[in-house]
Amino acid sequence: MKNNEVSRIKLPAIFTDNMVFQRRAHVCIWGEAQDTEYIEAAIAGQIRRTKVVDGRFELKLNPMEAGGPYELCVKAMQTDEQGAVNKNESGTIAADTIVFKNVLVGEVWLAGGQSNMELELQNSDNGKEVVAHTQDDLLRFYYTPKVSYICDELLKAEEESCWMKCEPGTTAAWSAVVYYWAVRIRKELDVPVGIIGCNWGGTYAHNWVSRESLLSHERTAHFVTEYEDMVAHQDFDEYLKELDEYREYYKEWVKRVDACYAKNPEIEWSKVLEICGENRWPGPSGPHFEYRPYGLYESMLIRVAPYTIKGALYYQGENDENNNEIYDILLENLITEWRRLWHDDELAFSIVQLPVHDPDTEKTGRGWGGIRRAQDKICRTIKNTSLTVITDCGNKKNIHPTDKKTVGERLAENTLKDIYGLAGYNGNGARLAGYELTCRDGHEGILLHFSGAEDGFYRKKEDCEGAASQEELVRVDNPGEKMVFGAGDSKNVPLGFEIGSRNIAAGSDNDKNEKVTYYRAIAELAGGDIFIYNENVSGPVSARYGNDNYFRPIFLDKCGRPIVPFWI
């Protein structure tokens, strides 16, 4: 049930029937209470009590193993002058009581990020067929209301929100990535799973952290100061008028786009734009703007924190392309902030690295490569984090690729391996294990050694976009035979390997002005090693792989997974 309007107790909206509590953790129960001294919570044979202070309370349940269904009873209690708990005429405790039914205990995760995390199951590959067959009473989902600021609309949306069981009538709008992740986790751990969806398409990392967090670093403080300076000089009434006009325009634009796809599901995005026109996204900025700094932190994230969770699944970064040089700072701040908010210094983060995408046919951008590098750095340097590589799951023209099953299942594999510490799981392909500067057949280059490529490299039978299944793979290197691949494919799409040489700035008499320039590299395969070179590069000093917005990750392991991007 939801909070009783006449009750003296008010719990956050996320507490409803069918919720899932985190196993083996001190589950936090918190809220507000009026005209009462104590709050008592009882579940699965345990009773916990805490004092109400300044109208607020917080208590922790003792850790529980996976199980259920249970009832959670939360009571408001008074004491008499001697400090004894008051009882009514029947001898029972006099209290206002809220009872939550069908509560499970298992694994609880929050799903954060932007539109690729948000993309609904019904809109993913084979989505409608999958939705029709979803049925699992032990898999639950709570979607945090998407409202950009604190208002009556948000309070109403929270009142209507609830934990949903996995069944055809509910799963259509669930995150596709999360659904496939959760199904795999359910199968492997054999415990109930609860997901808290807390994401919004088009968002930046700085939307999901506090004002104080952004101000704490000199390279992120400008997000706050520039926004607040703009608001200080803004005519609020005029802003609201512009916002209403934009929202009405946006609704009509979406209708036109939907009509295009309804008429021709295979229509290219460029054709859609010809018909519907470019969207005037993202609309006017201001206090009600969903993309303002620290906005969704206030209207979404803290509305569900500190509901006890194991960790966060995080798929975001596309919109931070132009912030790629500071994205490592932004992502580290976000992890630190969320861990502070949940009072858990080891809150797990399972991060999806950006796939490939670049609709600009005139040039290949680098912003997404910078985001990938930051994501890689964070997951190598911050404890209890995991990175899932999906460079083979992207699409050049569509920023929202619809194969979310591969993404979700790989994310689950890496979560099981890196967060739960279970053997026998791995969602990523070959990883750079070492390298050496060497010369082959007169070419100066770098010999790359990989772990996870002991069986050599494979590629798809048909080198097209989308993830490869194991049945589609053919080995591309024969033992003892040298095979050479150019810097790009037949369509001049780069294969992702680059080699760097050091150029000394004119007039320099020391190494301080040295600069590394990268060139497309030719790849020569021999077993599980790759030798890269460029005929115009002598004295190579570095290499990188996966730094382009869009490249063709043709070298896969025997399970069809791409090489993990690297920078050396």
Where are these regions (language model features)?
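Cell-envelope and extracellular/periplasmic
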Residues: 1-568
